[in-house]
């Protein structure tokens, strides 16, 4: 199994370590590779789009010619997990809590509507306990950093976890989106669930 991690910015190293732990837990002989240009997508079984600044990630991905290829592969069934800014990249509809509608480059493959900076600047970073029973796990302490919120889901998209009634983890077929940072959590539950998607 080969998993690619988009490596322009964001926590590549932390996702790498969480994936390694999840591989070890499941006794999977897996390979993890950084993805920056289209040829890096060759032969991968799944891809992670980490946090960072979603507009920057989108612009760089577009400039390097990977944005359209990613969209094509994800639409054709490549398993993907987008965390925080990565979730924004996957959404079909994006607006900003302060400035309203945005026109940033997106993959736009998931039937969700996302509001960037949902919790406001004063809550730039916080931790919260969420219930992961819908993915067969217990409660987990997770980290939110300038987090967006999934405010609308349609089609086959399901909400898998909520915080105060707002979706923080959603799934649609081969696509998983989290508004928190699972790579900074002390549990590998989310990465394990992603590997379960990859294994099919």
Swiss-Prot record:
Its EC number is 4.3.3.6, 3.5.1.2. One of its GO terms (molecular function) is pyridoxal 5'-phosphate synthase (glutamine hydrolysing) activity. Keywords: Glutamine amidotransferase, Hydrolase, Lyase, Pyridoxal phosphate. One of its GO terms (cellular component) is glutaminase complex. It comes from the Archaea. One of its GO terms (biological process) is pyridoxal phosphate biosynthetic process. Pathway: Cofactor biosynthesis; pyridoxal 5'-phosphate biosynthesis. It catalyses: aldehydo-D-ribose 5-phosphate + D-glyceraldehyde 3-phosphate + L-glutamine = pyridoxal 5'-phosphate + L-glutamate + phosphate + 3 H2O + H(+); L-glutamine + H2O = L-glutamate + NH4(+). L-glutamine binds at residues 52-54, 116, 145-146. The active site is at residues 84, 181, 183. HAMAP family: PdxT (MF_01615). Catalyzes the hydrolysis of glutamine to glutamate and ammonia as part of the biosynthesis of pyridoxal 5'-phosphate. The resulting ammonia molecule is channeled to the active site of PdxS. Belongs to the glutaminase PdxT/SNO family. In the presence of PdxS, forms a dodecamer of heterodimers. Only shows activity in the heterodimer. PANTHER family: PYRIDOXAL 5'-PHOSPHATE SYNTHASE SUBUNIT SNO, PYRIDOXAL 5'-PHOSPHATE SYNTHASE SUBUNIT SNO1-RELATED. This is Pyridoxal 5'-phosphate synthase subunit PdxT. It comes from Saccharolobus islandicus (strain Y.N.15.51 / Yellowstone #2).
């Amino acid at each position: 199994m080969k998993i690619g991690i988009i490596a322009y910015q964001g926590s590549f190293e932390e996702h790498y370590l969480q994936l390694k732990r999840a591989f070890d837990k499941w006794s999977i002989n897996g390979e993890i590779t950084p993805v920056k240009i289209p040829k890096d997508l060759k032969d991968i079984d799944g891809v992670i789009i980490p946090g960072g600044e979603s507009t920057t990630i989108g612009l760089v991905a577009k400039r390097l010619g990977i944005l359209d290829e990613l969209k094509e592969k994800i639409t054709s069934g490549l398993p993907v997990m987008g965390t925080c800014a990565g979730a924004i990249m996957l959404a079909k509809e994006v607006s900003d809590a302060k400035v309203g509608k945005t026109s940033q480059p997106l993959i736009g493959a998931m039937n969700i509507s996302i509001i960037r900076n949902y919790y406001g600047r004063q809550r730039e970073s916080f931790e919260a306990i969420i219930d992961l029973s819908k993915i067969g796990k217990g409660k987990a302490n997770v980290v939110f950093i300038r987090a967006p919120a999934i405010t609308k889901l349609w089609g086959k998209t399901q909400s898998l976890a909520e915080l105060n009634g707002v979706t923080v983890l959603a799934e649609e077929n081969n696509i998983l989106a989290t508004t928190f940072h699972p790579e900074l959590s002390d549990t590998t539950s989310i990465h394990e669930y992603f590997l379960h998607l990859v294994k099919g």
